[in-house]
Amino acid sequence: MKLASRPWLATALLATTVLVSACSDDDDGGNGPATPPAPTNVQAPAVTETSVSLTWNTVTGADIYVVQREVAAAPVVRGAALSVTRVFETVGTPATNAFTDETVTGGTTYNYRVAAVVDGTQGTFSTPIEVVVGAGPKVAIVDEDITADRTFFADSTYVLTGFIHVANGATLFIQPGTTIQGDFEVVGSSLFVLRGSRIEAAGTAEAPIVFTSERAAGQRLAGDWGGLIIVGDGIINRTGPIILEGTGTNTNNNYPVDYAGGDNNADDSGTLRYVRVEFGGYGPLQDAELNGLTMAAVGSGTTIEYVQVLRGLDDSFEWFGGAVDAKYLVSYESGDDHFDMSEGYAGRIQYAIAFQSEVPTQRPGAGNASGDPQSVENDGCNGAGCLLGHASTPFTQPLLANFTLVGPAAGVFTAGSGGYGMVLRRGTAGYYVNGLVARFEKAAYSLRDTETANRVGDGSLILSHVVDAEVGAQFHAGQTGGTFDPGTFSLTPSALTAAATFLALPANPAAAGDFDWTPAAGSEATAGGMSPFTGNILTKAGAAVTATTYRGAVDPAGPKWWTAWTAYADN
């Protein structure tokens, strides 16, 4: 508790003491009042960056207490001797045995002592106690491009103000446990790692690296900032220049970023490990948005593992060409697609979870809500620079293994063409194996257009060993992209609901502990996986992807790889 100080009384007492001393020659030799004892058990039970709260044992008869503070002094030289000058100053004269000093400076060490005043006589001071006042949270504003190697330290929060580019061959190192925020006042503030530069962001399960909103918990929305964008030197199937979606507004350093023309699918743009990207997304134009994590022409030398994207305005993960592999991905409540691959992406992804229960509320002015959200949406080639249209090469041909896709309950996606588990279109190829697709009102799989059917026909597009539960249909009817025979390709319909398929799938999750993605006993996902791989899938997997006897993103025998480092929040 903080009590009113009484400096006037302390001054009066000092004057009285001096007067008594001066007149003592005229007294009759009496002993005078006894000196009050020093207060005992002086403690500082509460210390913040701006205050120190002190308590001590009561001294019998005390009218007030004198609290003094000394800033811990450095040794000084006096002649040939080394000594320490100690200067205490009075900071309070409370009437009770507690006092809060609110004039401290963060990052400073202080010594405190207390004396009692009884009947006008000040007693002996207590032995000083040392109190270290913490420096408090450090905030670093990042408002210009990073063109030389730099480290973001875990003891600081970094605020991206505008569109920040790691460029000129620089490497950005980020320590485990570091928080990076997008400036809420500068819409779309983002971090770009451009071609030839690198990011080394290796967190741990106990100390993940978090990219998030500047707003306080409870006030955060999709689109509060832009996102994390990596541009590599990999190959895409469009001829350029091809300007990255969401760039080129030429405001707040948002200049056009061209990602075409790369020729090295083994390029190395660094590391993302145990990283969360929260409440991002920025869409200056319809169908031209920044995502939670955008990977444009990123090569396979880059490491992407244990990454979560949470409540972004647009896609959670989007790959434009390149061949970067990824493992252990979690997408939670996406504003558009959870996993979007296009323009010749040829990487391998294993262990991926997507969960959707609602349409996220977005920040006004940050962009437009999607009209066709899916869990997986893969395209071959589309738009300017596709010289052969949807048949442009190299084909989009990922390997997606051990995926768990959970959609919203019926009626959540009421408009547009969204709401499918997997949409494969515009000439995409790829291998989709050992998966679990649950709770999609329309259908589990939607294969569209004749060029996609050509990929099915030549064996470069395979959907195999996947369980579907609580879906309106296995295949989207009336499409021309082809289908797969469920018996031949082990596409297994389940009689279980989505909730019964897992150990724990809450309707309104509030914390990581609410989820358990482990398949429940009796679920078809506990078995039936393609193991070993064969044919084109074996060739594509190489040493990067392991065949499993189970289906879905989680081994029934463990580990629960998503725990400790992921987060689940509405705002």
What are these regions (language model features)?
Residues A116-G120, T178, R215:
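Surface-exposed loop/turn motifs at beta-strand-loop junctions within extracellular Ig-like
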